[in-house]
């Protein structure tokens, strides 16, 4: 206690001594008197004007799963059987909902059913007005092929395409192409695309990963920054992608929640949009009535890869009463994931399941297929077994056994049926080092382009008159003899006709359709009496010596596989388009020359895996990527 008092007295003594010294120095005011830090003087500043935030549509995703909650606060034990059972029931319910969404919808739908009632009345009216009258200014297949000049092109020596007039004209118009509009058309990854043949509108139909078909009117709409037409500071700070024209886009739920693998227009009526999906159905969207209906359905577990429909102006046999699977204009060919080719006659009322004619032509999945326009009995396939094959479907119909039930996998394929198809109906094949993903015939029928996963694009040149198999040729001769009336005298046809196929080009060159039964009978007889091509004139290997184009095709898991597509206007210099891993859309000539590479550093930030061109007008290209975004390129006026 005494020590603490001594300490306190010493402390107080020091305080008094310090105060005395500070009084003598005159600094009793503390640190403020001796120049210590003082508070800063605040000068009034002009208040900063806050930028008015731009109103954006609410894009907050709807939460599907329930909100997280505490099981402890709810009174559940950590290893409660009741809680486990609850979670299992919720998972099972979610699985059933997902499976039901992927299950095919066989009923017809109107516009409100395809939009789910989410579109406003004004948007629906705008869509209906866009779809009306699209087929008024479209061109038929016969108008796109100048067949009288085609014989001269085949017989004459072709000049070097580097110096040809057609090549220079094509390069000139391709070099004028610029990006006109860009927009998000579908909610998910784009799988397929088709350009409407109308010359009045740039209307594109886009299929995505979950059964939606986006309708995009790609015509650019002028951007208005504000009501007065004067850009403000806020407008200048906006991203260029938001200011860029987008056109108009609508989304229709045509199929179930499965990828739309192929979209094509009916060659008879361009107001009908045909589409296939992994839900194993083919549906028709009527643009005039804005209704969708199913036209064919297969087995639920057999996925559809691609299809093609024969054009009525390809041959006169469309007028025959008996459907011919190689020449009927209402014939649809479908390739599936089990290695099968299916033939459908659209005039048949029953078009479901095992009633369809099917042939097992490949061991594994067929990823792509194309029907030759000038030789419709020839079908090219690209499959997972690393082959591109050419088949004569006349031999399929006559000597190859049909396989109504698709095998579950490649182990269930009947070896005898497969060997019969590949030895009797197949007449050419080309093997790649890895899987083949794309194949497409040119509109002139004399060139074929294929894409494979070994980073190469191949282009073959061929004569349509040499695209046949021995058994297919025998079938044609037998059919002609059986259909020929007694006492008929064979017409003398010039030898040059045999070089281009049995009456196909002459049929295409007709300016007027056949109006009477007599004209129809004469046209059919002319095709039947045409001299048959000879096996001795056909090359030993039709798919030999292709033009090889190095191309990175490693799209991986999250991108749609690249597909090379020819421009369908046969009057132009042959050229095709394909996507690129360098985020460019590329245009190639038939000889492998890169004619144009399209890219915009500000607006194209993803790989444009899917491409398509206008079938009539030159240099009009649309691309699509994995986010559902499309770009539209066309020449400057």
Curated annotation (Swiss-Prot):
WD repeats lie at residues 185-226, 255-295, 297-321, 361-401, 431-470, 556-598, 602-637. One of its GO terms (cellular component) is nucleus. Transmembrane segments: none annotated. One of its GO terms (molecular function) is DNA binding. InterPro entries: WD40/YVTN_repeat-like_dom_sf, WD40_repeat_dom_sf, WD40_rpt, WD_repeat_DNA-damage-binding. Keywords: DNA damage, DNA-binding, Repeat, WD repeat. Residues 8-23, 74-91 have a biased composition (Basic and acidic residues). SUPFAM superfamilies: WD40 repeat-like. Pfam families: WD40. Residues 1-91, 144-168, 482-508, 525-549 are annotated as: Disordered. GO terms for biological process: DNA damage response; regulation of DNA damage checkpoint. DNA-binding protein that binds to both single- and double-stranded DNA. Binds preferentially to UV-damaged DNA. May be involved in DNA-metabolic processes. Belongs to the WD repeat DDB2/WDR76 family. This is DNA damage-binding protein CMR1. It comes from Mycosarcoma maydis.
């Amino acid at each position: 206690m005494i020590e603490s008092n001594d300490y306190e007295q010493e402390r107080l003594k020091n305080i008094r001594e310090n105060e005395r010294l500070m009084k003598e120095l005159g600094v009793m005011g503390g640190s403020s008197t001796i120049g210590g830090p003082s508070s800063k003087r605040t000068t009034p500043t002009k208040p900063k004007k806050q930028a008015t935030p731009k109103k954006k549509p609410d894009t907050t995703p709807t939460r599907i799963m329930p909100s997280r909650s505490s099981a402890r606060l709810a009174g559940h034990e950590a290893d409660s059987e009741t809680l486990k059972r609850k979670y299992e029931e919720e998972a099972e319910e979610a699985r059933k909902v997902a499976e039901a969404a992927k299950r095919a919808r066989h009923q017809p739908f109107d516009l409100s059913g395809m939009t789910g009632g989410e579109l406003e009345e004004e948007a629906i009216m705008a869509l209906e007005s866009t779809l009306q009258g699209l087929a008024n200014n479209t061109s038929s297949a016969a108008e796109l092929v100048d067949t009288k000049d085609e014989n001269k092109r085949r017989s004459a020596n072709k000049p070097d395409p580097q110096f040809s007039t057609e090549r220079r004209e094509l390069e000139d118009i391709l070099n004028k192409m610029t990006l006109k509009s860009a927009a998000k058309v579908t909610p998910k990854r784009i799988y397929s695309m088709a350009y409407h043949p109308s010359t009045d509108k740039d209307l594109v139909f886009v299929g995505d990963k979950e059964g939606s078909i986006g309708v995009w009117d790609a015509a650019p709409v002028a951007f208005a920054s504000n009501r007065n037409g004067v850009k403000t500071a806020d407008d200048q700070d906006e991203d260029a992608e938001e200011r860029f024209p987008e056109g108009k886009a609508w989304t229709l739920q045509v199929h179930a929640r499965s990828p739309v693998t192929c979209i094509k227009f009916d060659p008879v009526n361009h107001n009908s949009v045909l589409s296939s999906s992994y839900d194993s159905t083919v549906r028709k969207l009527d643009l005039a009535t804005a209704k969708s209906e199913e036209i064919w359905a297969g087995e639920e577990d057999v996925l559809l890869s691609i299809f093609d429909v024969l054009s009525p102006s390809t041959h006169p046999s469309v007028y025959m009463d008996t459907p011919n699977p190689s020449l009927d204009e209402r014939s649809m060919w479908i390739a599936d994931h089990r290695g099968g080719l299916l033939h459908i006659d659209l005039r048949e009322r029953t078009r479901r399941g095992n009633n369809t004619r099917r042939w097992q032509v490949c061991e594994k999945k067929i990823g792509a297929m194309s029907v030759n326009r000038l030789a419709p009995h020839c079908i090219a396939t690209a499959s997972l077994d690393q082959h591109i094959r050419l088949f004569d479907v006349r031999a399929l119909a006559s000597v190859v056994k049909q396989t109504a039930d698709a095998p579950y996998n490649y182990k269930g394929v009947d070896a005898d049926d497969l060997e019969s198809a590949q030895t009797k109906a197949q007449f050419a094949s080309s093997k790649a080092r890895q899987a083949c993903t794309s194949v497409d015939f040119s509109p002139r029928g004399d060139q074929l382009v294929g894409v494979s996963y070994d980073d190469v694009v191949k282009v073959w040149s061929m004569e349509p008159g040499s695209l046949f198999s021995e058994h297919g040729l025998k079938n044609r001769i037998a059919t002609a003899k059986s259909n020929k009336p007694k006492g008929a005298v064979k017409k003398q046809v010039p030898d040059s006709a045999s070089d281009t196929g049995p009456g196909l080009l002459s049929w295409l060159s007709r300016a007027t359709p056949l109006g009477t039964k007599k004209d129809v009978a004469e046209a059919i007889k002319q095709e039947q009496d045409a001299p048959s091509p000879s096996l001795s004139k056909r090359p030993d290997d039709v798919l030999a010596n292709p033009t090889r184009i190095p191309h990175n095709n490693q799209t991986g898991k999250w991108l749609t596989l690249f597909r090379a597509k020819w421009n369908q206007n046969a009057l132009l210099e042959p050229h095709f388009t394909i996507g690129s891993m360098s985020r460019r859309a590329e245009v190639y000539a038939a000889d492998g020359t890169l004619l144009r590479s399209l890219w915009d550093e500000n607006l194209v930030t993803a790989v444009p895996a899917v491409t398509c061109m206008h079938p009539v007008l030159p240099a009009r290209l649309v691309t699509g990527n994995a986010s559902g975004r499309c770009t539209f390129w066309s020449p400057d006026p």
